[in-house]
């Protein structure tokens, strides 16, 4: 009788442990795979772009369909290349970089404008308009964001708890 109780307790603990582990893994994968969807719906401060941040940060986790003119480079740092507009978006040392027309625009970890680097005299004469640049980025990479699937089990509330302080 005593062996039965110990065995039952042991089996119950193992089942409970596997259940908690399974739920934790499901939650982790759900938040990563649907991060762009959740980021599109998170309340955030003006000037921050959580969806663009999640697009690059979680490129290895999100749905990355084959789209004509879009290439994904994840052999070290994540980069998304638009071959039609000859631009790319990447993350480097905690910042985000957008490269187009012989200039690289730097953004901080919340996608707020930081700096510009020019690689030609012609590019130096170009005035940088932050809102115009962000519209170009959205135009170049919106085909990826538009096809992100809606989660079956919506964990928006948990995503908001985790990332709210970063984007406000």
Predicted regions: what is each one?
Residues 87-168:
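Non-cytosolic head/periplasmic domains of membrane-anchored proteins
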């Amino acid at each position: 009788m005593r062996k039965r109780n110990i065995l039952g307790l042991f089996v119950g603990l193992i089942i409970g442990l596997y259940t908690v582990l399974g739920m934790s893994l499901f939650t982790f994968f759900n938040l990563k795979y649907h991060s762009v969807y959740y980021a599109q719906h998170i309340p955030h401060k003006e000037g921050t772009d959580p969806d663009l941040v999640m697009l690059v940060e979680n490129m290895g986790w999100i749905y990355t369909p084959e789209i004509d003119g879009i290439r994904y480079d994840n052999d070290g740092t994540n980069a998304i290349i638009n071959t039609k507009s000859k631009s790319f978006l990447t993350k480097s040392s905690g910042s985000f970089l957008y490269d187009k027309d012989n200039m690289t625009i730097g953004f901080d970890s919340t996608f707020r404008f930081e700096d510009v680097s020019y690689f030609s005299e012609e590019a130096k004469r170009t005035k940088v308009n932050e809102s115009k640049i962000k519209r170009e980025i959205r135009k170049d990479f919106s085909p990826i964001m538009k096809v992100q699937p809606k989660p079956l089990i919506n964990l928006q509330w948990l995503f908001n708890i985790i990332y709210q302080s970063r984007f406000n």
